[in-house]
Amino acid sequence: MTRVKRGYIARRRRKKIRFFASSFRGAHSRLTRTIAQQKIRALVSAHRDRDRQKRDFRRLWITRINAAIRERGVYYNYSKFIHDLYKRQLLLNRKILAQIAILNPNCIYMIYNEIIKKEDCKKYLEII
């Protein structure tokens, strides 16, 4: 049986996956079979961690908002704040609120005070 060297097509395929793995260490960037396995593994990790990143950032935003709110009022926390925002129909998402809490704390205190004023007025009217 004659030997087939596969030629251009196989070389092009190997070159493509070698380029992908050029930053990997050791055999993971040199051996074709190992490169193919590590490429699959890298893509799986990237896919999984895109979802994990969304969860992690949401958790970070919530922590930052909660810290900023609790500085102001001892009895007031994140869940009450978000609930009152929805009742007032203030459409600010968690990412924006966290940025405001970090970069401009006075602004988040203004939002907080607006909500508190309206809530206190409603409670006062209910008592009367």
From Swiss-Prot:
GO CC annotation terms, alphabetical: chloroplast; ribonucleoprotein complex; ribosome
The keyword Ribonucleoprotein is annotated on this UniProt entry: yes
Record has Phosphoprotein as a keyword: no
Pfam families: Ribosomal_L20
CDD domains: Ribosomal_L20
Subcellular location: Plastid, Chloroplast
GO terms under biological process: ribosomal large subunit assembly; translation
Family: Belongs to the bacterial ribosomal protein bL20 family.
Subunit text: Component of the chloroplast large ribosomal subunit (LSU). Mature 70S chloroplast ribosomes of higher plants consist of a small (30S) and a large (50S) subunit. The 30S small subunit contains 1 molecule of ribosomal RNA (16S rRNA) and 24 different proteins. The 50S large subunit contains 3 rRNA molecules (23S, 5S and 4.5S rRNA) and 33 different proteins.
The protein, known as: Large ribosomal subunit protein bL20c
Gene: rpl20
